[in-house]
A protein has these predicted regions:
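N-terminal subdomain of nucleotide-sugar transferases
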Residues: 1-53
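Conserved donor-binding/catalytic core segment of Leloir-type glycosyltransferases
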Residues: 7, 195-212, 217-221, 234-236
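Nucleotide-sugar donor phosphate/pyrophosphate-binding loop at the beta->alpha transition
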Residues: 122-124, 131-151, 187
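Carbohydrate-associated surface elements
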Residues: 164, 184
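Nucleotide-activated donor-binding/catalytic signature segment of Leloir-type glycosyltransferases, i.e.
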Residues: 245-263
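Aromatic "clamp/platform" in nucleotide-sugar-dependent glycosyltransferases that forms part
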Residues: 283
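Short hydrophobic beta-strand element within catalytic cores of glycosyltransferases
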Residues: 300-303, 320
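Conserved acidic donor-binding segment of nucleotide-sugar-dependent glycosyltransferases
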Residues: 315, 319-326, 334-339
């Protein structure tokens, strides 16, 4: 099959208002571009702008990326109308795609249904949203379920990023063909560490929202420090770092806990390569890129046994725990005392390379496109 024109659209995508939102979608698009011609179209509201529409058309990492900003209002129906119009205006500027690759079954992706109805362009949808996990079903509104059913019914394939999410979508009544295609890692950027840090270093990177439990990680580190002085914790990311700094100051822990702001991917890789153990202590997750990235640098992880995490972490590359602070303490102590034997960094990296590299994920998506377009 010759290279096909694939248009990525998404409910979430990095933009000037939310620079890291949906960055995993951008990485999927970059992977797909290894074997196809890819363009990206996104539309989002900006309440600060004067113009009804602004078109931000750029080449990002070799891919034409058009973000359409519409003037956001307090009227949700007007906002939705402007968003759909923004998508139509943006679509008119793009190459006609052979297939649309939509992301996240929220109302914006009704645009994929519109393109199918009007132009007979088939679409697949990658699903990342933890809202469809069983633990969150009670929060799903009837409107959200109705919209997602319309999108699912019209999709050629739904591609959840974890087996766990696929099972929960089936249990929600989803009848569309499904296949897991996981998140992707740039294994050339997230390369194996060359040496280990002098001081044992734990690392946590996230958006620091409550479900990631950054304060509980701090609390556990304070307790561990009462017994051990031979470690440090680096914690930060795209979130409220100042609140963490306040807690650290109040506990006089500045000497061994350091925070950092939002990082570039290169900086994330550098942090991981200069750490001994990554910590992800979330209440729920889907298939977190950050764990794959950590393993790709040869850094094992302590992570909660939720969502798709057990599909990534096992006793050879980390420790699975419940979201109990006592279990987090015990796991950190075991790792610090070197009482666990993980695979060597090359084996950890090769696991990611062989399953989640740009090339592997590009191949999985392209095989699905071929099946639909043959």
């Amino acid at each position: 099959m010759s290279k096909k024109n694939i248009l990525f659209i998404s409910s979430w995508f990095p933009n000037k208002i939310e620079p890291t939102n949906g960055n995993f979608v951008q990485r999927h698009a970059e992977a797909v571009s290894f074997k196809n011609e890819v363009e990206i179209l996104h539309c989002i509201g900006d309440s600060s702008q004067k113009n009804t529409y602004i078109f931000d058309d750029k080449i990002i990492n070799g891919i034409r990326t058009l973000v359409v900003y519409y003037q956001n209002t307090k009227n949700p129906l007007l906002n939705f109308s402007r968003r759909m119009t923004g998508y139509k205006k943006g679509f008119a500027k793009m190459k006609t795609p052979d297939l649309v690759h939509a992301n996240v079954m929220q109302k914006s992706m009704l645009f994929a249904v519109y393109l199918k109805m009007k132009y007979k362009i088939p679409f697949v949808i990658t699903e990342h949203w933890s809202g469809f996990l069983n633990i969150n079903w009670s929060k799903l509104s009837k409107v959200q379920l109705f919209i997602s059913k319309i999108i699912a019914k019209n999709a050629s394939y739904i591609l959840p990023v974890s087996q766990y999410l696929l099972s929960d979508l089936k249990n929600l009544g989803c009848k569309t063909k499904m296949k897991v295609v996981e998140n992707v890692v740039d294994t050339h950027l997230f390369k194996i560490k060359s040496e280990t840090p002098e001081i044992f270093t734990f690392l946590h990177i996230s958006n620091l929202i409550p479900l990631k439990n950054p304060e509980k990680i701090l609390k556990t580190a304070f307790k561990l420090r009462e017994k051990y002085s031979n470690f440090r914790l680096h914690i930060g990311g795209d979130g409220d770092v100042e609140n963490l700094n306040k807690i650290i100051r109040n506990n006089k822990a500045e000497s061994f806990i350091k925070t950092f702001p939002m990082l570039t991917l290169k900086e994330v890789s550098d942090k991981m390569r200069n750490s001994d153990c990554f910590i992800l202590f979330s209440d729920y997750e889907n298939f977190p890129c950050v764990l794959l990235e950590s393993l790709s640098t040869g850094t094992p992880a302590i992570a909660t046994k939720v969502g798709g995490i057990p599909e990534i972490i096992n006793k050879k590359n980390g420790i699975l725990i419940s979201n109990s602070e006592a279990e987090l303490y015990d796991a950190m102590e075991l790792v610090l005392q070197k009482k666990v034997n993980f695979d060597n960094p090359k084996i950890l990296h090769d696991f990611v390379e062989n399953h989640f590299s740009m090339e592997k994920i590009a191949e999985k998506f392209t095989n699905i496109y071929k099946e639909i377009l043959r």
